[in-house]
Amino acid sequence: EEVDARLVSSVISSEICAVARRAALMAERRLADAGRGGPPVDYATIVPGPAGRGESLLAADQDHAIVYAEGEPDGPADQWFAALGEEISSILDAVGIPFCKGGVMSKNAAWRMSRARWLETIDRWVRRQRPEDLLNVDIFFDAVGVHGSLSLAEGLLDHAYDEGRRTHSFIKLLSENARGARVPLTLFRNLKTDSDGRIDLKMHGLFPLVAGARVLAIKHGVRARATPGRLQALADLGLVGESKGADLIEAHRTILTAMLTQQLMDGEQGIRLSSRVAPGRLNERTRAALTRAVTAIETMTDLVSEGRF
């Protein structure tokens, strides 16, 4: 029976955030037991990306970051938090949330900094000049604090949104990035699959919707994290037509549902879970809905291309 993947992804994301919080607590205890004491200064554990948006599915890996109140790179505080990040990463991997292929983990210095260094980093991000320089930067705007001094996390996000909104070149880069994905349709508007009969719906389905909603949200000061919430807020502001907004929200639901349905089928057959969907294995109704959803993605691309950013 088909399920609404938005509910499932919200539950999965909530669990990932809860596990990340518990991992941070366990990591603190491990360091204390090893004679390294407790946190030297206030800090927060942050979860960016799909889990922060509430949109993770079954093939999720770990994304997390740390902001601490003060301290220099490689100084005593940073060394303590580096050890904490290593423990958090190892704990999450051990319980089935694998290491992030993109390195978005607090064991890595790029995702573990003092508040002052984070503010400097965000300022550098928004002044970058090439779309390829935005790798993993955009997911920070989906982040949520899950443990510790959450005001530290919220302060960073407030700064990121404020700086991003007022920096036109950054908004333009994000928009170029959002327009870059190929919509998987043939000349005759059928679903276009790869040689294995599958489509990467994360890259060619979710990404244009998520990235487009994100850049419009940043530009217009919408602080909703979930893609449907961003789209609805943009529609409420009159920036996206009510009908178009509804179509995009439904497209997001349909694509998530197709991905979850495929993951459940693959799991039953021992196939590694991924974001790749085989339309030929979906029932006719789901396949038709997926075709409509992919077609609707062009609406988002058009909205960004029209200069709504």
Where are each of the predicted segments found?
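A nucleotide- and high-energy phosphate-metabolite-utilizing enzyme signature
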Residues: 1-309
